[in-house]
C-alpha cells in the first residue's frame, strides 16, 4: 500500500510501521486494552466494550484491520467465529448474520435480525483477503464472499426478508425487513 502519511505529512515508513504496531498491540495483544479475544475452538471475537457483547460491525471491522495489516491467522479466527456463531443457517434469515451475540456465541434477541454494515464489511474484507492471500489456504475467500452476496441478494420479501441492497434504489437497506426496505431506510439515514 502507498504510505499516505509519508506522501502528505512527511511521516517516514519506519514511524508509520511503529505507530501501526502500537495500535495493533493496543487492540489485539495487550491484556489490559485489547478487544480481540481468542477462544478454545480456534476462533476469536472482537468484544464491544460499550455494549458488552460481540457485533457484526466489530467482527467485520476487525477482519478488515487484519487483512490490511497482513494478519491472516487472526483474520481466519475472526471469520471462523462469525460463521460458527453469528451466521443464520436456516429459516428466512438464512445467509445473514446475527448482528449481536454474547462472547460465548449465543445470539441475542427473540427475533432474528441483522445489521447490514456487518455483512458489507464481511464481504469486502473477504474479497481483500482473496487478493492478499489467495484462495488455496483454509478458506477460499473469494468463494466465501460470493456466497454471502448470493445469499443476501436472493431474498424476494415473501417471508418478510429482503435483499441487502434495494434493487430499485441500489442503496444498502439498514435492516432488510419490509419496513426498512420499502421506506428506503439506509444505514447512513438520519435517526430521529
What are these regions (language model features)?
Residues 185-190:
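Conserved small/polar residues in nucleotide/adenosyl-binding loops
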Residues 1-57, 68-109, 159-164:
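Low-complexity, Ser/Thr/Pro/Gly-enriched N-terminal "stalk/linker" regions
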Residues 57-70, 119-129:
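Extended, hydrophobic/aromatic-rich amphipathic alpha-helical segments that build helical scaffolds
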Residues 84-184:
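Extended ligand-binding groove/face enriched in aromatic
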